[in-house]
Amino acid sequence: MADEKTEDRRPATLVGAAAATFATNAGTVTFSLLNVLILARALGPTGRGEVAFVIAVWVLTAGLATLGFEEANGNLGGRHPERRASLATNSVVAALALGILGALIVGLLMTLVPRTRGEVDLGLLLFALATLPSGLLGQNLKYLLQSDYRFGVTNLAWFASPAVTAVSNGVLALSGALTVERVVLIFVATNVLATLILVVSVARHFGFGRPDAALARESLSFGLKTHLSKFMALGAYRGDQWLLGAIVGPYELGLYSIAASLAEALFYVSGVIVLVQRPHLVRAVSAQAAEFAARIFRRAVVLSTAVGAALFVAAPTLCVLLFGKSFRGSGDDLRLLALGALGVLALDLFSGVIVAQRRPLLASAGTAVALLVTVIGNIILVPVLGGGGTAVAKSAAFTAGGATMVLIFLRMFDAPPGALIPRLDDVAWYGRKLREGLLAARRAG
């Protein structure tokens, strides 16, 4: 039975939500990297590249097919709790219709233009694409639950997929039975599992109401405004792997994908911040949003800089130590990707701020710049430099896109540039939180 109460569940502070989400993120990253390690050791660069290509195609197609319904759920669900049940049912309808349509379009493209699928088996790609409705539904329901600050269950779903994936692939690898086809099957199955977790939670807390055509039109109207920006951002993040695999094949993609997986530690810093600040920013007036976002950005710069510097120094040794000598070339790619750390942060965080303040079209500027640099850079550099060319293009794209969003944020909120420069207090903030955490742990013990 669905909960009858729809009052605002806003917590007194976002620190707890951020800490829980970041802890889940740390576990997710750990299992994701463990899975990358298993695949690299068991399948080698070429097999790893084939898997990366299938996942890149699936993720990009899902991003294209959403039409922004998940973003609309985040905003409409946050402002109108009484409409969540209808939003849930509309999410199911949209996921089915758009997922099937997206799979048909991309499947037809790859059938008619074989070069777009590189050297990967068409049947394997079509199998993965057939599960798009489940993936879209999971995205829609995740944002709906987060609009009610239900980060616990979305964190569970987020964590379950890579955890089960890593364990399953590990068992198969130890038995010598791991293949590219089985890896893709497990990827699909664990995504369905994550979606089922969210479906159960939505049914319990909101229920599934009657479909609402007027509400669907409102969701589509808002969603389309955010869709271009979000898909371009996804293209900047994942489009390089599709391009690299199609242009030079799975071996180079296998090397690059290892570096990209390790570099995702940079992306998760900004990704977690955007998730936990979204419900607050949706409800905040302009001045509050500007002050809040600037403070969060300064503190995140401190963390992103530290993570980026550590990756740059450790990259060559780290790739060989974890994945073996056959992945030696991944170290140079990782160093190049680490240079884009602050660009990633600025692009993600300020795009999220502007979308939450109901200016989704404006948020597309930075992602448009990033995607343009990504595509042009890959076309020019990949035939000459392989995966290294993709890494250069990606860092340049994030830096250019992030700089664009900084300028837009400062102008939109009339904020001084100095508001974004980290201060000693921002560094000290981490020390204070660490001491508070240790003290709380000591008291609990």
Task: Give the positions of each predicted feature.
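Interhelical loop/hinge segments that connect adjacent transmembrane helices in multipass membrane
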Residues: 1-14, 152, 176-186, 196-237, ...
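Signature of the first transmembrane helix
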Residues: 3, 10-70, 131, 224-251, ...
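Interfacial segments at transmembrane-helix termini and the short loops linking adjacent helices
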Residues: 10, 45-48, 110-128, 313-342, ...
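Membrane-water interface segments that mark the loop-to-transmembrane alpha-helix transition
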Residues: 15-28, 32, 54, 63-110, ...
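Transmembrane helical elements of multi-pass membrane transporters/channels
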Residues: 16-32, 154, 158-165, 183-202, ...
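Helix-loop junctions and terminal segments of transmembrane helices
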Residues: 65-82, 263-287, 351-356
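Membrane-interface junctions at transmembrane-helix termini in multi-pass inner-membrane proteins
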Residues: 75-79, 134-156, 283, 339-366
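Hydrophobic alpha-helical transmembrane segments
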Residues: 121-127, 155-204, 369, 373, ...
